[in-house]
């Protein structure tokens, strides 16, 4: 196996990429990745555009196995030992939360192997951010502390047989991240696309077809891959998720999403209340404010025992109680709603599905609803948690 670099001593290089932003980069003394001949990176293939080929009518369909993907990447075997697990070969629109739970369980078992350095999951880009987020919340703090290894999700915006296919480059960069030997400041779950590394908790797909489709609004990437160099921002680990509740056997909770619109009178909120869902995510305007005529329906939902979380329709920025007008975040807090911080509605839905499917969480919810909501608020926005609940009190 050929080494990419011969250095063995690590040094820390600090530089300013932009004013008042401190970036710490971990590199070897010759600036190259340390090749780990005795370590293995597992390619966990789920499907997606990265695995698609054109059918007889010219439409893209999932067709390539994980082994086929690896064969198209020159130099991949030179980085480390590669193993492949073919979990599925589907478009990511067909990936369900139940599949995400199974992926999480299998990946955690793989990471327990002492010879495994990390896992790279090849996945469709449409729901890649959701699977990444689910993995980040399903890794307990205890597991992350014991098995300090990265999970890297990647995909492509172009089919496997397209001119200029980006899949091979994304896969190569992701394996470099997974076998990078300096992991103290690396979030356990990241997305690596177009040589940028994003935290699962912040990343979003922001373009339907551009190869630079993934961004982290308000935050930016936590690192990047440059040839054989892998850089990480100082403090990137702070964007990790992880909870103390055990992983549920099944996702039994029912959670809905409602997007607030002008003139909304809460009809969809009333519908979900009638369906006795366990949780409801409401996308508000801007800071999270809702139409005043929607508030009676929100109150009814909360009074019926539904956990309501308010998010924003905007792609960047956080929920904040800046206004005192009817339908404001202040009103929602007083009713008992939880604020979603900077998380998207799709990610908050997965968080509620995960937490509300756990027997211990349901027990806490029954015994002390206020404490449970405080815990939920802490998960979603620890910075605002104490202040938001003091307002309600």
Range-by-range predicted roles:
Residues 3-35, 284-393:
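C-terminal non-catalytic interaction/assembly regions of soluble proteins
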Residues 52-53, 127-132, 164-171, 289-291:
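Short glycine/serine/threonine-rich phosphate/pyrophosphate-binding segments
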Residues 53-57, 132-133, 163-166, 198-205, ...:
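Short acidic, glycine/serine/threonine-rich loops at helix termini
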Residues 17, 21-31, 35-48, 54, ...:
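Accessory alpha-helical/coil subdomains and C-terminal extensions
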Residues 113-128, 275-287:
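Short acidic, glycine-rich surface-loop motifs adjacent to enzyme active sites
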Residues 2-110, 316, 361:
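ATP/NTP phosphate-donor binding region
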Residues 153-227:
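Internal gly/pro-rich beta-alpha loop/helix module
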Residues 121-148, 290-299:
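Short Gly/Thr/Asp-enriched flexible loops that form oxyanion-binding sites at enzyme active sites
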